[in-house]
């Protein structure tokens, strides 16, 4: 039987960086390559009903081995890695018996406790890091490795009774499209867990309400020598728009349950400037107010510069899954119990982001999020503890056992 980190090291060799510009699903060929590889592996270890959809989703089912009426539990992870940094030619480094000090990644980069204050908690453990030139891909190939390893363990230990275990690997989560083509009905689970969290112990069932905002500003260009009273510089109107938003409610100044508006991109010249924002808030009313503020600012500026100067287009992306999870809190409570059984203290924090599970919960599949063990996702300083990965496998198995014993 393969060890969880051995699987992980195989998966990260496949470049699965997603790309929101391609407008196809999956957005990159590497995700299809990994999906086919996973489907073959699942078949080889004895999993039933393995299939890949046209959109590249991998679905499988390990059939129940007992006659009891046991809930059908799903475990889901995503195959893509973030567009933020290259996932090509990932060259992981193994750091055995970590000494709590700086780790030289190579290529002039150092992973240090001054940058990652949590590092000393991994002293004595075995870590997997990057070589400084790419991200690692623990988000979310660690989750995939943990699920497959847990499933193989069940197959090799038929004395462990379980109901139907549903497996799902999705493309394009990192560009917000992971649930777009997910076949909830065909998946057939009563509820599920994503393995897409970070530090050991993380258990999440709250996430941001999320929207995007596109702001387009139309100016008027006139020769600067005779522009007085005529020119409208769309770049300066854009600056005015941004200054009318709460200046302290931005990602770099917020934490916990605090929401924000985040200016992602600005493209402009005198006659036209475009702004791209994301809007985030945990509270439904606060989320509504943030979106309304964008329209109010547009209204004020149109009154000042002329109707049609500023146009705002808002699009909801995903909602806080808390309202869909709370009526079935046994899903969260069982995960807590499963962690405590293997000596892990659950860390229940809100997700300052989203997961496939957030959207799946509103599609009828309640899906909280479990840790994978990774740290510093999406960049060259990403790393993961093998010990944490092994504990994630234990948690999956404990969840399955708890439901089988009820």
UniProtKB/Swiss-Prot annotation:
Binding site for Zn(2+) 1: 78, 139, 196
Active site (catalytic residues): 80, 173 (proton acceptor)
Record key words, sorted: Aminopeptidase, Cytoplasm, Hydrolase, Metal-binding, Metalloprotease, Protease, Zinc
Cofactors: Zn(2+)
GO molecular function list: metallopeptidase activity; tripeptide aminopeptidase activity; zinc ion binding
GO cellular component: cytosol
Reactions the enzyme catalyzes: Release of the N-terminal residue from a tripeptide
Paired cysteines (S-S): none
UniProt GO BP: peptide catabolic process; proteolysis
EC number annotated for this UniProt entry: 3.4.11.4
Compartments, as annotated in UniProt: Cytoplasm
Superkingdom, taxonomy of origin: Bacteria
Signal peptide annotation: none
Cofactor binding notes: Binds 2 Zn(2+) ions per subunit.
Pfam families reported in the protein's UniProt record: M20_dimer, Peptidase_M20
Main location as per UniProt: cytoplasm
Enzyme kind, highest EC tier: hydrolase
InterPro entries: ArgE/DapE_CS, Bact_exopeptidase_dim_dom, Peptidase_M20, Peptidase_M20_dimer, Peptidase_M20B
Keyword Zinc among record annotations: yes
Residues annotated as binding Zn(2+) 2: 139, 174, 378
Keyword Manganese assigned: no
Family: Belongs to the peptidase M20B family.
Protein name: Peptidase T
């Amino acid at each position: 039987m393969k060890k969880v980190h051995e699987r992980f090291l195989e998966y990260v060799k496949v470049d699965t960086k997603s790309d929101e510009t391609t407008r196809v699903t999956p957005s990159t060929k590497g995700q299809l390559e990994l999906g086919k590889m996973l489907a073959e592996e699942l078949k080889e270890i004895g999993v039933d009903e393995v299939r890949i959809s046209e959109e590249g989703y991998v679905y499988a089912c390990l059939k129940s081995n007992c006659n009891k009426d046991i809930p059908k539990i799903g475990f889901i992870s995503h195959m893509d890695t973030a567009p933020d940094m290259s996932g090509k030619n990932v060259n992981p480094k193994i750091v055995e018996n970590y000494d709590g000090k700086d780790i030289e990644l190579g290529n002039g980069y150092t992973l240090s406790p001054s940058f990652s204050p949590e590092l000393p908690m991994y002293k004595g453990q075995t870590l997997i890091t990057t070589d400084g030139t790419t991200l690692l891909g623990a988000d979310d190939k660690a989750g995939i490795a943990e699920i497959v390893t847990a499933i193989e363990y069940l197959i090799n230990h038929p004395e462990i009774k379980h109901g139907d275990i549903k497996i799902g690997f999705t493309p394009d989560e990192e560009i917000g499209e992971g649930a777009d083509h997910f076949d909830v009905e065909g998946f057939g689970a009563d509820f599920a867990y994503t393995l897409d969290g970070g530090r050991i112990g993380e258990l999440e069932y709250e996430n941001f309400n999320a929207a995007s905002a596109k702001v387009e500003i139309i100016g008027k260009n006139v020769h600067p020598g005779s522009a007085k009273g005529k020119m409208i510089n769309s770049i300066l109107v854009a600056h005015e728009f941004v200054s009318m938003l709460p200046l302290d409610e931005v990602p770099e100044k917020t934490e916990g349950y605090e929401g924000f508006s985040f200016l992602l991109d600005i493209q402009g010249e005198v006659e036209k400037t475009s702004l791209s924002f994301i809007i985030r808030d945990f509270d439904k009313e606060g989320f509504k107010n943030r979106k309304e503020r964008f329209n109010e600012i547009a209204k004020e500026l149109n009154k000042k510069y002329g109707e049609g100067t500023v146009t705002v287009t808002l699009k909801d992306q995903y909602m806080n899954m808390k309202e869909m999870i709370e009526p079935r809190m046994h899903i969260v409570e069982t995960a807590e119990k499963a962690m405590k059984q293997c000596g892990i203290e659950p860390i229940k924090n809100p997700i300052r982001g989203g997961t496939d599970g957030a959207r799946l919960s509103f599609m009828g599949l309640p899906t909280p999020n479990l840790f994978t063990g990774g740290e510093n996702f999406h960049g060259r300083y990403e790393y993961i503890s093998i010990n944490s990965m092994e504990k994630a496998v234990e948690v999956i198995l404990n969840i399955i056992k708890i439901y089988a014993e009820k």
